[in-house]
Amino acid sequence: MSRKLFSVLLVGLMLMTSLLVTISSTSAASLPTMPPSGYDQVRNGVPRGQVVNISYFSTATNSTRPARVYLPPGYSKDKKYSVLYLLHGIGGSENDWFEGGGRANVIADNLIAEGKIKPLIIVTPNTNAAGPGIADGYENFTKDLLNSLIPYIESNYSVYTDREHRAIAGLSMGGGQSFNIGLTNLDKFAYIGPISAAPNTYPNERLFPDGGKAAREKLKLLFIACGTNDSLIGFGQRVHEYCVANNINHVYWLIQGGGHDFNVWKPGLWNFLQMADEAGLTRDGNTPVPTPSPKPANTRIEAEDYDGINSSSIEIIGVPPEGGRGIGYITSGDYLVYKSIDFGNGATSFKAKVANANTSNIELRLNGPNGTLIGTLSVKSTGDWNTYEEQTCSISKVTGINDLYLVFKGPVNIDWFTFGVESSSTGLGDLNGDGNINSSDLQALKRHLLGISPLTGEALLRADVNRSGKVDSTDYSVLKRYILRIITEFPGQGDVQTPNPSVTPTQTPIPTISGNALRDYAEARGIKIGTCVNYPFYNNSDPTYNSILQREFSMVVCENEMKFDALQPRQNVFDFSKGDQLLAFAERNGMQMRGHTLIWHNQNPSWLTNGNWNRDSLLAVMKNHITTVMTHYKGKIVEWDVANECMDDSGNGLRSSIWRNVIGQDYLDYAFRYAREADPDALLFYNDYNIEDLGPKSNAVFNMIKSMKERGVPIDGVGFQCHFINGMSPEYLASIDQNIKRYAEIGVIVSFTEIDIRIPQSENPATAFQVQANNYKELMKICLANPNCNTFVMWGFTDKYTWIPGTFPGYGNPLIYDSNYNPKPAYNAIKEALMGY
């Protein structure tokens, strides 16, 4: 049947109860119709999907934003799913389509059970990216959806990532946004379903800037629906008429007597789901899902990282006080599946971090919900649902790789779990199995913890040197101390039987220290110790300064000579002379060099700050600067501060700067991508102050970097500037340690980049210097204890030359040598920390 004849027949249907005008696509064989009674009601015997609450960091708003995700019945990470992004109306929220009358999850459950659609995932964002109904929020939400939410979903759920498995639909304001986002991003969406579109709908010439050419070529389904009594009917009708005039295939459905409410929106969704399914949304993409890699049982397994689920009530929840994620709203009979758990030579105990206001049981079964029972954790009350504690139980010995089922016999919140696994016969600490415990094993553990080369099987079991049931930075610290002979046995070896190694390990003695300088001890501990330098000093204007610099430090960084105004004082005129001199000094003295900094809101030349830029022209300036500078120093600078001090001090988004104000919120993504292209081997850092401990600004930067990693932005590390005031408390120092550890969990290196500890001039120097020494020592110990911390750079080394008095009146003496080049107590304290004291 020709399209012309088909259209004529459909016009005849206009006399029916549901007024219908359709210009049909060949991929949509069915016609819209009113759904049967009970289509949106929970039915007995119908498997139910799960609706989970999520939060993600948005680069558009520089904040954490909420959304909800519908996972279909039987959701499994072994399968791939298509995704519908379903938008709410003005003044609404991410809850409306599930709890505000929409019942989208129930509609989908029933359609899946009837075989009318294949299982898919539905995501309901909060579209108020500036504020409810605020116009700027429309543009912000587009960036939020495309640059943050979609990448988050694709990183955390088993979904297809191509346009032909992605749809967008919405009601009222969300209908207008479906038009706007869908039709102007046809490289992202093939199925678009505006229902009762609101006045925020773009004009036709903006929706179809090419006269409809892309829509004709790329659209798999454009479904437009509205009620005949809806005062907003004209907005969808306008688009419909344009499509008719320009031969754009679409479906236009009017519900006779329908208003602006869920009596139209739910039938619209019911039809859109089926027509999108028929048009190919949920077709098999023929993309095989790889078999999950075995997960070692003795590592910490996050509860939310399950591979299968049977429950519609379980939700991913926040875990106080750390702010992580866990599983809650569990009911009796629910179970979670964790595939390919490697129990190694034998697991004999189970440990979980749980919260429970009452008591309940968790059954541990293998390879099925009714499979072999290996143990039961009797969960004791922790007092309330927000108080978590570790609880353990013994289990029957289990070996090899099995699927684990946690079968719940009552409510409980669970953060993570792990198993106690017997150690390998080749001995703790001998990660490469060569019979020796030495720096090669330490490097292997460091690469594992950084996510560069994950350990598996026997090697991972041997890495648990403190026998805690997980492999983390504590094991790195213990192994390092063992290799340096600070300790002579691993924790627990005196009271826990360890199998005799087949080859007796020969312990490597502490590395030979070729001198007595800080750099000698730092090299033995595997870290770099450095200082910033200003041009006159590495130009040998002060011989004493120069002598200390080359003797004590293994890394240098220009204080000012490699900032934008110094390197490119006039557009396209670069001056590398001073930076090159420091590099030559470093190379002569066996030092490494950090690059500081490519992008900053300060110390920019006037031609840049006063220029008449638009987004594209300023991006070109940015790319040219980063590419030219990094290419000049390619292979010679090991760490680059790509961007410096970009977060507002409040933590509420990026600070105002020429980069943010002209390019937009995504300018950092471009900067890091340009940097990686210029020098693929350099480590790329974001550097900032007041982000060392846990707090609003620190949390904002962490969430920003985590989001960048999830989106594939090539960032390797974060620089903690560490400009401190003397007298840091143990609690404050512990907070720094916690912050470093959370970066390790997402595979991010931490460098201490600009350390100084300023002292109030009113304090007694003798007492203050000792407090300062203790603070420096604790900072070094924190860095040594964390394998993702390998750089310890001070912002100068002598109180004779420091920026502090001129910037912080009433403060001084921040460094480790006094003004006469005498080592202060802080110098010796750092050395003691490096020696393991």
UniProtKB/Swiss-Prot annotation:
Residues 299-420 form the CBM6 domain. Residues 512-833 form the GH10 domain. It catalyses: Endohydrolysis of (1->4)-beta-D-xylosidic linkages in xylans. The active site is at E645 (proton donor), E754 (nucleophile). SMART domains: CBD_IV, Glyco_10. It is an enzyme of class 3 (hydrolase). Disulfide bonds join C783-C789. Residues 424-492 form the Dockerin domain. Residues 1-28 form the signal peptide. Keywords: Carbohydrate metabolism, Disulfide bond, Glycosidase, Hydrolase, Polysaccharide degradation, Signal, Xylan degradation. Belongs to the glycosyl hydrolase 10 (cellulase F) family. This is Endo-1,4-beta-xylanase Z. It comes from Acetivibrio thermocellus (strain ATCC 27405 / DSM 1237 / JCM 9322 / NBRC 103400 / NCIMB 10682 / NRRL B-4536 / VPI 7372). The gene is xynZ.
